[in-house]
Amino acid sequence: MVTRSEILVRGIVQGVGFRPYVYTQASRLDLRGRVRNSTGGVLIELEGKQGDIVQFVADLETNAPPLSAIESVECNHYLAPADYPDFVILQSAEEPGESAGETQFVPIAADFATCIDCLKELSDRSDRRYQYPFINCTNCGPRFTIIEDIPYDRERTTMREFAMCAECRSEYENPLNRRFHAEPTACHACGPQLFLSKAGSDNELFRSGGRSPLQEAAFRRLTNPASKQVANSGVLEQTRRLLLAGEVVAIKGIGGFHLVCDALNPEAVARLRGRKYREDKPFALMAASVALIRKHCEVSDEEESLLTSPCRPIVLLERKPSSNVPHAVAPGGNNLGFMLPYSPLHQLLLKDIDRPLVMTSGNVSDEPICFADNQASDRLREIADYFLWHDRRIHMRTDDSVARVHDGREIVLRRSRGYAPEPIKTALKFETQILACGAELKNTFCLTRDNYAFVSHHIGDLENLETLQSFTEGIEHFKRLFHLRPEAVAYDVHPEYLSTKYALATDEIARKIPIQHHHAHIASCMADNEIEGEVIGVAMDGLGFGTDGRLWGGEFFVADFVAAERIAHLANVPMPGGTKAIREPWRMAAVYLQHAFGDEFLNLELPFVKELEQRGWPTLRSMIATGTNCPETSSMGRLFDAVSSLLGVRSTVNYEGQAAIELEAMADRDSLGEYEFRIDDSAGVIESQDVIHSAVSDLLGGTPPAVVAARFHRGVARLITTVAEQVRAQRKLNRVALSGGVFQNMLLLTEAKWRLRASGFEVFTHARVPTNDGGISLGQASIANARIKSGRVN
């Protein structure tokens, strides 16, 4: 018997080849009807045998297009037949009675790596897109970085500047073609092209956004696709030769510019570091294949899956001792950050290069990545020797994402290209649309709607005008794309954060909700894991403004989404010089030594102490004694810095977390022993004197610093477990949430999770959003939502 069904599919189902897929599946099962994009997702009407319709739904749920993400399939079966003669794809339309400004909302896909089908065409000499650097289809290519407005069609992307040729138009309009309504569709004949120029040349022209006269003349001479293909190939061959000759090339990609050089050329690496003012922070690498990466790093099956995933993040991998990548690429660490080519341009560039390339963000240190041609020409001309340009505009800058595998699963450390703007689906219902402004460092913002949390791409450190502009532009773009009108704004309680000042100055949002930094960390972990109710929250990081006006960072809470009760914390110590103590960890080492030994520590026969007079200890001691510019802190991150400096690892740093990263790298994992913190149960204060005494005693006794480093890590893991056990005994809680930048330390995280699980705890850590401050905005939004729903906020 013939019956009819209506099926609404919600999720990331538009712009990802979903309607052609539905058309093909319906035709295969001899079903009639129609499919169209609706304001809620994709609406399908099917008419035929009920068994075939059931089979269609089953296939839909298990074998959807690769870039889609189905969140729900709502079926209304056994409707009266409409006698459809065939199956057709209809144009998009609003639902009757709906207001587009209020209800039209469909998640937008991220930018995804080149798919297998496009890669085959890229290398097929008989294909008309052979070696075309911008090949794409509905299963891959740019999305977020080229969208200017919605609904998502070519006229609202930067591809509107390229009129499709007849062949591309035919594919674009063919429901059975995988380029059906693939908005970035292009080819040699009608799409973007490559150009190579020496740094500093044609500078005025790039300011105006056009091509140079030379480029324009060359472009006009190319009258057919074959000659354009030859020209693009020639540009790429020239670029390869320049890189292998030791030059630094700024290459325009999908979300911005990279600064690129030969990773095996120490002189090129050193030159890039010097020009970029990036002394030690590790560079990312790109290699043509997993096989090439395996020459330099250990790669597990899970890590290979992550490397080859459509998101194509930079994956942190364990470096092999046999690797010939210069240590200057990633000084002081045991890891290398590798990614595979994710765009056809990268695929073609690396095709004949049997070595990794440095592929670092195209920016001056501390500034956001360059994405506009004129901006890159101005900012990067003193860093790059050459520029490899293309003429497809980037609308939204996006950095590479960073991830790693831990405990068998992916954990995201920087969520950007390939992940954003896809929303984080949560167990929470956001009845109020909220803007959460995030933290100062590693900033992201978050906007909410329904069950979605739109955590932004990585913005960076909000410490200059350029990054603040990127932050504000990003917020407006997300509001426009997802039809969001936030009614509340959540922000960090630190009064000097630029994100806080922005929130307080936002006049159009009256409801303002301050959120304590470390409560936001714990809430972020809870939202990431889709759990509710009270947890034992452990928040450890560099610092965050506490409710008592001090700088927190070694905190234990009993927390839920509404409130956080501070149960225990590291003892407060002075931070002489304020932020200067972050850049100069020796200051914290001196503080902790004085805290443990008094001024008698100056008699200790330690190399650190012998060098202290030259570093200005008398001035520092005076500052501590008088409290001059000495904010108090309970930060675990600062304690890691102190131990690192005490062991002679790092007395000054050039990037955030460097001292702790190098301390972790040098720790002897095969050694035995651990240090013990003293806990004042009545006050919940955790004293570190015994740890410092033990470390000094070991050093004086000839224990290698690598063993001391390992014992310190185990001591912190033991502390976490001990406090959690005490809280469990008092409060009958058995769930522990670990959050904060300190838990990027894999040695500590592994040890802490193992001990907690051995003690019977259920342990929650981050996966979908970073454990560092990049996840703060999700926590802020979750807390604000809970407080609004509970009536804690008017």
Regions found by a protein language model. Give the residues of each.
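Glycine-rich phosphate-binding/hydrolytic loop that grips phosphoryl groups
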Residues: H518-M540, G544-G546, P585-Q594, R718, ...
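Internal gly/pro-rich beta-alpha loop/helix module
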Residues: N63, R156, E171, R179, ...
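A contiguous, well-structured pocket-lining segment that forms one wall/lid of small-molecule binding clefts
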Residues: G191-Q193, A439-H477, V591-N734, L747-W754
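A phosphate-binding glycine/aspartate-rich beta-alpha loop in the early core of alpha/beta enzymes
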Residues: G256-R319
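Conserved phosphate-binding/catalytic loops in two-lobed NTP-binding clefts
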Residues: D492, I509-H521, N734-S739, M746, ...
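Intrinsically disordered, low-complexity, mixed-charge
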Residues: M1-P184, H188, P192-F195
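Short glycine-rich phosphate-binding loop at a beta-alpha junction
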Residues: A250, H483-P495, R731-V742
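Conserved phosphate-binding catalytic cores of ATP/NTP-utilizing and phosphoryl-transfer enzymes
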Residues: R294-V299, L348, I369-A376, S401, ...
